[in-house]
Swiss-Prot record:
Pathway: Isoprenoid biosynthesis; isopentenyl diphosphate biosynthesis via DXP pathway; isopentenyl diphosphate from 1-deoxy-D-xylulose 5-phosphate: step 4/6. GO terms for biological process: isopentenyl diphosphate biosynthetic process, methylerythritol 4-phosphate pathway; terpenoid biosynthetic process. Binds 1 divalent metal cation per subunit. This is 2-C-methyl-D-erythritol 2,4-cyclodiphosphate synthase. It comes from Leptospira biflexa serovar Patoc (strain Patoc 1 / ATCC 23582 / Paris). Belongs to the IspF family.
Amino acid sequence: MFRVGNGIDFHKLIHEPFRPLVLAGVEIKSEFAFLGHSDADVILHAVADAILGALSLGDIGVHFPDTDPQYKNMKSTRIIEKCLELVAEKKFKLINVDCTYVGDHPKISPIRAELNASLANITKLPLDCVSIKATTSEGMGALGRSEGVMVMATVLIESLKK
């Protein structure tokens, strides 16, 4: 049996030269950062929600509430680690991850290979089983004004139960 999960996440872009801008576990050189309770890794948050959705286990707000101080500035790689533990506990296996990044900053094309490699490493998947694509909102709305970014993620999991 296969299951599909979808996740979506938004983060506001702020001028904060001393806060790291993190995407797919990679710190990107920038004078900007994403506003968030954790490290605000918008890619990993969308992937986590997709995994939790495929497992019918809610979302990251249920498992890692932003009202809990223990999660302040937490690395989002830890969120993915916990999600992968849940995948194993429920006797499933992660098959692939597909992400679409919507935003103007930072540009994904120059760092795509590094982001894909990091996402593959974090999710313990082969490189050809992860994908990060990018587009813009063509200048429309908050995303078009570079006020923030959005990531949509889709995952496929397979049951290991016979």
